[in-house]
């Protein structure tokens, strides 16, 4: 499936940021408590989130296996030119670091709700950005 097709399909696109994945794996929240119907949603994350999670120093084999198992249930969105250009625009205009700019751009391009508990992302006002606090 092409990335652009995800933005026009029926249903809700949900993009997990790194904190949202970590806290979900730590069982600090569950999707049903957010009122999210998984059956009617596409669960997505950026390739940057995958890289951040799996490049953690001193990651144990069990942690790595849990992360990979969770990510196997998501659509991991690669970096394409449209996301790249939007991330550059966001990075130039905000105090966000590049990884967060890429995650936000992914969410915007896919017309998705960004799941996070990062106040930098939740308080960001940007055209097309939709966020939901996981707590």
Predicted regions mapped to residue ranges:
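Acidic catalytic patch
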Residues: 73-93
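A generic structural signal for short hydrophobic patches within well-formed alpha-helices
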Residues: 21-22, 50-53, 84, 121-122
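Acidic, PIN/NYN-like endoribonuclease modules and their adjacent C-terminal/linker elements
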Residues: 1-13, 73, 108-135
């Amino acid at each position: 499936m092409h990335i652009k097709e995800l933005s026009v399909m029926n249903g809700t696109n949900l993009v997990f940021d790194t904190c949202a994945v970590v806290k979900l794996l730590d069982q600090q929240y569950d999707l049903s408590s957010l009122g999210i119907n998984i059956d009617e949603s596409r669960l997505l994350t950026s390739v940057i989130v995958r890289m951040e999670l799996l490049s953690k120093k001193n990651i144990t084999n069990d942690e790595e296996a849990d992360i990979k198992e969770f990510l196997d249930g998501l659509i991991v969105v690669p970096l394409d030119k449209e996301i790249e250009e939007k991330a550059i625009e966001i990075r130039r205009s905000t105090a966000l670091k590049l990884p967060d700019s890429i995650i936000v751009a992914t969410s915007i391009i896919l017309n998705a709700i960004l799941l996070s508990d990062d106040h930098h992302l939740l308080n960001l006002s940007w055209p097309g950005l939709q966020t939901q606090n996981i707590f």
